Amino acid sequence: MLFPVLLLLKLVIGALIIDASALSWHDLKWPRDLRPLAHHDLLYMGQISEEDRGDFNATLRNFLVPRVVGSQKHREVREFIVRSLKDLDWDVEEDCFDGQTPHGIKPFCNVIATLNPSACHRLVLACHYDSLLHKEGTFIGATDSAVPCAQLLYLARSLNGKLQNQKTRGDGLTLQLVFFDGEEAFERWSSHDSLYGSRHLAQKWHEDRTSAERLESCLERSEIANQIDRMEVMVLLDLLGAENPRFYSYFGETQPVYRRLVNIESRLNDAGLMELPRRRRRTNYFSNSSTVGFIEDDHIPFLKRSVPIVHIIPSPFPDVWHTLDDNEQNLHHPTISNLNKIFKAFVSEYLQL
């Protein structure tokens, strides 16, 4: 993601943040019924056992290594993602290609895992798995984006039974996980030196033609001409793992979806299920406010092709962003655990698990 944009956000955020309740955005109709989770289901999603914590931490350790494009560790991380999702009986595709970079031709591979490839519509959760080539030393990128990668795999594992049941319903909706390669610039962020994987995949899916007649249970009035059109919404996770992040709704079109995250966090707080320090009574990660989405990230190539976007990235960025301090020691595990609860409930609610 682009650093000058962060500076711009800090300068104008006071002028641009708008109370969502003052807008008509929350009255927009989403094409799907976003019914709140039943209370007992919310309580279930808000419980994380010690076994779950151990599973998540074990998963995370596989990502807490330098993951520079073209390196051995980068390849091992990709293989771990593929193996983990194949073990859960997901359909896994590797979108591999060679790309021109300031450091010459480099190999890239996006990983796309789809629970039910026949389903017409897709709830897409995404992150990037590569790490920055840092000039000053070994960069781990714990928030950027080891934690988001581990969270996606954790969601697939922890919800596996419910997801497999949903897969057999034939309701035309499925979960898709996308792990982008080559998000980071090799030298200086530009339209050519960044977002290698997402630019390639967006173009590929735009050119991959299909139709509603060939797919399972498309919604009425759905206009499906290519794979891009099957993306009902992309939820992009980035820079997660620092204490007390602050998120905003960056796109009016997806305000109804973003508000589900606000609501879920509030309900989990009401139920006493969030992990809090003694001095705090509630978390307040998901602001009930909107701001203009200036940040450049892997969603941009899809946004340009009219894919609805929810961008879960903190503003401001974590203090450790693009420094060698973005490592395991500076992660805040209670915050990560709280976000895992929110994401589990969100996926369960959206897919009506």
Curated annotation (Swiss-Prot):
Keyword Aminoacyl-tRNA synthetase: no
Keywords noted in UniProt: Acyltransferase, Disulfide bond, Glycoprotein, Metal-binding, Secreted, Signal, Transferase, Zinc
GO cellular component: extracellular region
EC numbers on record: 2.3.2.5
CDD domains in the cross-refs: M28_QC_like
Superkingdom assignment: Eukaryota
Sugar-modified residues: 57, 288
Upregulation: Strongly up-regulated in salivary gland during blood-feeding on the host. Peak expression is detected 48 hours after feeding begins.
Disruption phenotype: RNAi-mediated knockdown results in reduced enzymatic activity in midgut and salivary gland tissue extracts. Weight gain after feeding is reduced. Females lay very small eggs which fail to hatch into larvae.
Expression by tissue: Detected in salivary gland and midgut.
One GO BP annotation of this record: peptidyl-pyroglutamic acid biosynthetic process, using glutaminyl-peptide cyclotransferase
Signal peptide range: 1-22
Disulphide-bridged cysteine pairs: 96-109, 120-218, 127-149
InterPro entries assigned to the protein according to its UniProt record, in alphabetical order: M28_QC (IPR037457), Peptidase_M28 (IPR007484), QC/QCL (IPR040234)
Record-annotated active site: 183 (proton acceptor), 238 (proton acceptor)
Chain sites annotated for binding Zn(2+): 144, 184, 322
Family indicated by similarity: Belongs to the glutaminyl-peptide cyclotransferase family.
Protein name: Glutaminyl-peptide cyclotransferase
Organism: Ixodes scapularis
